[in-house]
Amino acid sequence: MKYDFTSIIDRHGMDAIAVDSWGEIPGMAPNAPDEGFDRIPMWVADMNFATVPTVQEHIIQRAQHPMFGYFNPRPEYFDRIIEWQSRRNGVEGLLPEHIGYENGVLGGVVSTLRAYVQPGDAVLVHSPTYIGFTKSIEAAGYRIVHSPLKLDDQGVWRMDFEDVERKLAQNHIHAAVFCSPHNPCGRVWERDEIERAMDIYRQHDCVVISDEIWSDIILPGHKHIPTQSVSEDARMRTVALYAPSKTFNLAGLVGSYHIIYNETLRDRVRTVSNKTHYNEMNVLSMHALIGAYQSQGCEWVDELNQVLAGNIEYFCNYVDEHFAGVSYSRPQGTYMVFLDCTEWCREHGRDIQWLLDEGARVGVGYQDGRPFHGPCHIRVNLALPLSRVREACDRLDRYVFNAR
């Protein structure tokens, strides 16, 4: 491969909660490991790979100038987004005026809700649910109504369209948050599924907030379908949210963006976000996006997805062979696997907290699935060198799931 996805980079002391926050965030971060075990971060959703070199190059080049005053986004910022969306997702007709900066995807979610629904109103969200949705939507004063995903006979997560319709009607819901690809389940929705969902939202006059931050992390054999692309109505009722952060490991720089084609919808969302003045772009995050959304970035992402596919294949095969009673739906996108440990816990007389604590004790920091509405689940991040995935599997085998 052209790019390095095998080096183990020491992140300690380099502003990374993935390694430095163990034992410091009760209920979220793993406990500190026992002496003799180094930390393998498999919890928070960032990667343990160096970003594409062009990101650093663009940041360094800008940082060599000694002034960082007020600024307007460069035309190149919009050009890179338009070209990236065209190349990666086949998006046509995207113009600079359709694009707006967001100081995080969750900020975009809340701004859209504030533009269209009243505090106390219900918002439809699928479950399992990304914990960030839960915290931000509820903190903003809205009531979440969950429509649970269902596993089909092949173990693939599916939307329950009848349940969606029923929940929308019963709760008089006019806003829905759609996660595509889905976190934490890793589902890449097919066109006909999105079409059917969007038709239901049309019938119930719902504004749709489509979180597509994972849209570049798509495993072989699958394709991301932008929600706005499935119909003209979907294009006009959807606020789509993107970022280079998940793709290029840039969460610490903060720099998301929205795509809104509907002028009225766009004006209302921007009016809300402008009132707080929170939504100002950071000059270095602008240059990071410009550096990421280059031809080299495309090559890097293609290689990354090959690496992630290999990691997921290894991990899932290991679970099948060694962890009897643990099940999962193989992800089609993202770098997360959502493990269902219900049967294992029942057979061994343990609970999910024991699995979390014992994993952390031997340096494997995976994430509690309960805040994602997985009652006996663990969310596992596989965006790290394969050698670390192998080491984590070995420790979990010897010291946790098959400890003697």
Regions found by a protein language model. Name each.
Residues L308-A309, H322-R361, I378:
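Conserved PLP-binding catalytic core of the aspartate aminotransferase-like
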Residues Y142, Q203-C206, R235-M236:
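A short helix->loop->beta-strand "cap" motif at the edges of active sites that frequently abuts
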Residues A234, E347-R350, D357-R404:
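PLP-dependent enzyme catalytic core of the Aspartate aminotransferase-like
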Residues K2-G104, S111, S295, A403-R404:
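N-terminal small-domain helix-loop-helix segment of the aminotransferase-like
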Residues V125, H146, S210, Y366-D368:
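Hydrophobic residues in well-ordered beta-strands that form the structural core
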Residues R237-E321, S327-P331:
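PLP-dependent aminotransferase class I/II
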Residues F68-D199, D216-I217, G221-S229, D233, ...:
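Conserved core of the PLP fold type I
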